[in-house]
């Protein structure tokens, strides 16, 4: 039974379909919640319309990119089309396009539910914190269940229909490339609006957040959806697919060597159980009448983790799977939780780092920036150690199994860490839903009590969002280490037909080709981040000029005349146009750099390139995500009445810190882990070409 991979494929498909049915039930539950406030309904439709318009335009641009990429893939991958059988190239192209479609669907599903749940959550807060929390959480869970169900279904179908792991890498590349551009575009949109709204509204005019007089306020709320919902959904979809693809590449290679299909079966078994555990975790998630939303979200994550550990242990025993592989996957899962806890410590407004940055803000914005940068760098150490220990422990646990099992252990550690991604996405999507709900409550005049409730929910969302971003980056770290193993596996398979080829087991950093690749690879995340943040910079300056124009030219707007409304659509247009203009160059730079390094230095240079890219990318991603979350929550801590409260000099300094942190945590930081995955997949897909056609090989 343990060698019957088709059994576990069938189970995976069944569990995927169950997750879709559960997502539909959750969607209908949210839709049934009462909503009667006319002002909230009107503003909610503006947000929904803006988000759908942006997504349509973004996907139109990305469809052109995907079409061009599909032509190149057909011509050159897995080998030039004129050299032999054309069928593998057709299969690879279809797999790539399927990956882009699944990834795009993840973003679209997220937008649809988030722009319904935000209105329902705002009005539910009139009944208390419990119903409002459940509405926001279940709205996020629709996306969690749909995205992970799509992942498992997509990988299962590609594996079953093609019986080819290279096609899985093509599917993963499709998901990753679209996720890279979607995350970059959404991040530029959301932070353009957020920075502009904060600088003009809070710093210059001293008006509250989400004040309807601010022309950028609707664009800001649209940005929460296109960046934090659609972008993060595509991002975690991509990480999950990549971890399974890397594990299956090595599993199939091992199965060929030892006979049977036990290792492939293990990957599908654990992935299906992870989704089942997330379904149970979401279904049982509750918060007491006067409970703490942060505690409720974290408790659901811990429950899901425990369910996965128990069920996989039972499956390993019952089906006679390898216990060492189970150990590797559990290590990955536990380290994921630890990375989340570390991110929580540095970003939670009840912990010392946030208080220290708030205290520093009393002395001015320079000290806000300095303290935030310092704590951001310190926060990288626990996560980097965690990723390193997870990889090392998984490697050593599986080493006695021999052959390629140590690297397979690392791949399964990544699968384990991402096993509860259904719950992680649910928690992550909850954040922007309740953030929108808070804005709608203020614009809909629901009163101070409702604002207090939505502030509490929003604070929990910010804390959990920092945790989920740390988790996503940690998972990407293990995934790309596994993809490095998959790259070596692909190179050795391609080299087997070349006379005199010596199989690769590792890379020597004293080899100048490896060192060349390492230096270039390490620089890419920094340049990539800079390009995205400069995009936000340029776009925000255009929007700030537009906001100034409206306050200057529209009579009664600044004074709050109830009969005067800003031209919200102008700011949405600026954010959309700028994001679409800026989203392609950074991603294209990363992909082209990989290809150039490969053709110049060969597979040795690519090995160094990936190593440098992984280390520097993880460090920067963790630093930016945690520093940005720290500045954001320090500002909110001051706004809650500490260190002088709203309007104080400390508050103005904290707003400056938050403005710097916004593109850190919501544009560049979360996009880096997708960039690392994309270049790793490009390397694996083009390994044959790099092996035979490099300049200095």
Protein language model regions, located:
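Hydrophobic packing and interface segments
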Residues: 1-697
